[in-house]
Design a protein with these regions (language model features):
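Long, charge-dense accessory insertions within large macromolecular proteins
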Residues: 1-48, 52-202, 206-262
Length: 263
């Protein structure tokens, strides 16, 4: 439903195996706890309900060497943001360093799984750069990348785009129509639409973004100015808004009443 959810779903791992294991020993503290050997391989984010510690997220660059799963260990001083943060953690700068573990777990679940695409969404003001890397770490569903090493845009209409490999003359088709997707068994639908950012005759290189969903990405902050990367996009984390919070008897615990009317 969102690029972030796609990235976090692809990086989810569990110690219980492909079909799961419901024996009591698979839910022990030794399985749920965070071990020092996980540093540089797994992020600290996990669910805060019954899945705590059972389902985990790999970091952006987990250092997996091959399909067998062999991992190259690194010393703590050799680690950087890519080796330390999962995608959600990298999209929440400063929070992961200062929040308590329970708040971090809540942020992971609520940010990656409950986030919705809205028209007035914008990138974060303070980032680690992960919001700009996200389009290249996910599929073409929300940001379509050029699949050829060298290519040229042959045709652009309101419904489709055609890209041609300059060497082999192979063509790639990009659907620009509005598509409707269902939220699995959640019972509601979302719409996505890729809008082109290239013109007929424009030359492209591999992984150049040619079209993107404007609800998911934008270049509104930082990378859209003069001299910036014309293909540079940032993930829209949410709506930037000024909010006034007043504690009254209408609130419950850490909740508050929300109204469209502004005073």
């Amino acid at each position: 439903l969102t690029p972030l959810l796609e990235a976090e779903t692809a990086s989810k791992v569990t110690f219980k195996g492909l079909s799961g294991m419901n024996s009591e020993r698979s839910f022990g503290l030794d399985k749920r706890g965070y071990d020092k050997s996980m540093l540089g391989v797994l992020g600290i984010s996990t669910g805060f309900a019954s899945t705590v510690g059972i389902n985990r997220q790999t970091v952006i660059d987990a250092g997996v060497r091959n399909k067998r799963g062999f991992i190259t260990p690194k010393k703590p001083e050799e680690l950087n943001n890519l080796n330390t943060f999962s995608m959600m953690e990298a999209l929440s700068p400063l929070a992961i360093n200062h929040d308590d573990p329970f708040r971090t777990a809540m942020a992971f679940t609520q940010t990656s799984q409950h986030q919705m695409l809205v028209k007035k969404s914008m990138p974060s003001l303070i980032t680690t750069g992960a919001d700009e890397a996200l389009p290249y770490l996910t599929s073409n569903k929300f940001a379509y990348k050029c699949p050829f090493e060298k290519a040229v845009v042959k045709e652009v209409t309101k419904d489709y785009m055609i890209i041609e490999d300059t060497k082999t003359k192979q063509k790639d088709y990009v659907d620009l129509r509005t598509t409707i997707q269902k939220n699995s068994d959640g019972g509601f639908y979302i719409t996505t639409k890729l809008d082109p950012i290239v013109k007929v005759g424009q030359k492209l290189e591999g992984n150049d973004i040619v079209a993107y969903d404007k609800q998911s990405y934008s270049n509104a902050i930082g990378n859209g100015g003069k001299g910036g990367n014309p293909f540079g996009l940032s993930y829209n984390m949410g709506t930037l808004a000024k909010v006034a919070i007043m504690n009254t008897d209408l609130g419950y615990e850490d909740s508050c009443r929300s109204e469209e009317r502004r005073v």
